[in-house]
Amino acid sequence: MKDIDTLISNNALWSKMLVEEDPGFFEKLAQAQKPRFLWIGCSDSRVPAERLTGLEPGELFVHRNVANLVIHTDLNCLSVVQYAVDVLEVEHIIICGHYGCGGVQAAVENPELGLINNWLLHIRDIWFKHSSLLGEMPQERRLDTLCELNVMEQVYNLGHSTIMQSAWKRGQKVTIHGWAYGIHDGLLRDLDVTATNRETLEQRYRHGISNLKLKHANHK
């Protein structure tokens, strides 16, 4: 119980610190939320969205799952996206993967993990789709590249959702970004697949894949 009690103690200290810095902080926070950003990231405990972006409570709407997937049958994720886009009217959606992702590695190595294997089939599909590129790489670079490809594919998936297609059609200004986080250095990397409408979604996706192929060619 001691470890659990520590969490409560930490919370009390955190709350006290914020109130000392801004006495009206929680009163203002309780009134409403109006975040400009939706973060779709991995569940990995080493990727704390608010801390690594330097944002405060109320500034970042967050959805996390294993390997930061956006799947058209995942009502959990899509409900979050629809609320963020249609109700909160966020301006930016960030899909962020990370190097050293256990989900990506498990999708490649395919160990028997139970139910999670079904979830990881979506990454295995990406692995097979880009096998001609990935198959030529050493293992570490292959996993890093698959992490980046996974982000690009999820940006593409989200952009083709009815939620985003409808938002763009009605002229709503909401941009999708694809990033990768380095646990080894704490830095975010923009994968240059930013989409602001249906046209740029296709263009930036093709551009991102081409960049990865060029990057691989330069490593040969």
Swiss-Prot record:
**SUPFAM superfamilies given for it?**
beta-carbonic anhydrase, cab
The protein's name: Carbonic anhydrase 2
- UniProt: Zn(2+) binding residues: 42, 44, 98, 101
Concerning its family, UniProt says: Belongs to the beta-class carbonic anhydrase family.
Q: What top-tier enzyme class does this entry carry?
A: lyase
Q: Please provide the Gene Ontology terms (biological process) for this protein.
A: carbon utilization; protein homotetramerization
Q: What is its EC number?
A: 4.2.1.1
Q: Which gene encodes it?
A: can
Q: What cofactor does its activity depend on?
A: Zn(2+)
Q: Which UniProt keywords apply?
A: Lyase, Metal-binding, Zinc
* Domain of life the protein comes from: Bacteria
Which cellular components does GO assign to this protein? cytosol
Assembly and oligomerization: Homodimer.
List the source organism.
Escherichia coli (strain K12)
MF terms per GO, please? carbonate dehydratase activity; identical protein binding; zinc ion binding
